[in-house]
Amino acid sequence: MLLRPGHLLLNELHAVHAGGQPLVMDPAALPGVLASAAVVRAAAEGDVAVYGVNTGFGKLASTRINGADLARLQLNLIRSHCVGVGDALAAPVLRLMLATKAASLARGYSGVRPVVIDTLLAVHNAGLVPFVPSQGSVGASGDLAPLAHMTLALLGEGEFVVHQEGQPAAGVGVRRPAAAVLREHRIEPLVLTAKEGLALINGTQTSTALALHALFAFEPVLEAALVIGALTVDAARGSDAPFDPRIHALRGQPGQIDVAHCYRALLAGSAIRKSHEKMRPQAGAGHRPPPEGGVQPWQSQLLDGDDRVQDPYCLRCQPQVVGACLDQLRYASGVLLREANAVTDNPLVFAEDGAMLSGGNFHAEPVALAADAMACAIAEVGAIAERRIAMLIDSSVSRLPPFLSADAGLNSGFMIAHVTAASLASENKSMAHPASVDSLPTSANQEDHVSMATFAARRLQPMIANVAHILAIEWLAAAQGIEFLRPLTSSPALEAAHALLRQGVPAMPTDRLIAPDIEYASTLVHGGALGAVLRRLPGLPPLWTAAERLL
């Protein structure tokens, strides 16, 4: 794949994230890289103090460094900043870090030599995963500690995470000395010159990669939420009137309009919907009898005299809630796409006039705010799903058997499965607290306001896992609810979703172990199987327009 600095698309970043895509730098970037490197070389040979070239760092910026020590200065910088702790970052995150750092440096405003970019791409293309601890960055001045660990591996002093056989690991494996791994792959360890160490660790590539990692992981989960939410509407015999396009056009919120469209398409052709329309009493009319033949005991109660005027919010307001979440994800995807293409080094080198300007592009506040928006959206998708589960098991609202058990009392049904969903939804509410509003001064108050973007993005993965489990429980519950409406059928799309679950999870006429069923369904939610059901529907709007990812 051709890496075009400043012009990366989100679907290209997704391909990098997925792996197996060798990267080649656009040759058009080379002149700019050479020009900015010449400016740095001249500064290193000159008498003027230039931050990051011949001075100390942070609070020590006023300390002048002798010319003979400039290379050692950069090496010391990397070694001293390798202070991360915690679990290793996953391989997809490292792939994005390597690629976006190479693309940023290749913009030609960092003053590094081409060999720096070449080494980043060589490590990426070899499938190597530098060992980078996940904790230790406050998101300004850049993601210093994690990028230092990544850089140390390029120098042959750090570590790579590999399989026992010596093959690159997909985020798991054993840690091996970087020098040996580079030698096995015939990659020369990088030797730093003036400013290059600073350029490699000053930037927002870790927090951006973590946020992209979450964005890509949540896409199939959100698609699953739409399908499962629609299945719940049918299981509860909810109305499809709230999805009428005229309602949503009057508000004009794009995510809401698109989500309502999805629900209409998912519910189209449902025999349950049609029977609901036939059985709902008209104003002033008495109860109508249930249809003859094949009526189950609970079905007769459902069909006979369904006098509900409005559905609960968890059914009726799904376009408003999930649509707003979709809008936030679209906003975040735009921020992250710009950040992945950005130059977030400091100081910046402008070869056209030889200027080297100190600024603050390393401050990851845009990423922090985008990640916080994603956290709220992720939490809300899970929160409304938990409410739908609660509605399904409450027979006074859903008019299904209590806890979706035909012999409630002897059987507890989905009683405690809902408790698990409530627990996970509560966890997400706590984790959704905005990280960006927190700041602690560092570097003796020189770096006195920071973004906390790295944590803001890193906490998204466990939140997504929680939502996937909540949706898995809802899927099980909604499918069980559909069983009580047989022989009526849902729409073709929703019957496909029901059948997909039934391939590994049978109906539950009596109590049994549910935990394996939850894990099975959660794997399908994560894996995009329900998104495939959604994408097969004709005429759907693209959910990921801003991300240049179409359904």
Where are these regions (language model features)?
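A broadly conserved amphipathic alpha-helix scaffold signal in soluble, globular proteins
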Residues: 118-125, 145-148, 152, 223
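FAD-binding core of FAD-dependent oxidoreductases
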Residues: 51-73, 80-103, 133-155, 172-174, ...
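Cysteine-centered functional microenvironments
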Residues: 132-137, 352, 356
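C-terminal auxiliary extensions adjacent to catalytic cores
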Residues: 1-21, 25-32, 36-44, 70, ...
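Polyanion/phosphate-binding surface patch
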Residues: 48, 63, 259
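Generic alpha-helix structural propensity
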Residues: 28-31, 35, 52, 68, ...
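Glycine-rich, flexible loop motifs
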Residues: 1-47, 77-133, 233, 248
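Conserved, non-catalytic sequence blocks in retroelement Pol enzymes and Pol-derived host proteins
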Residues: 109, 138-140, 409
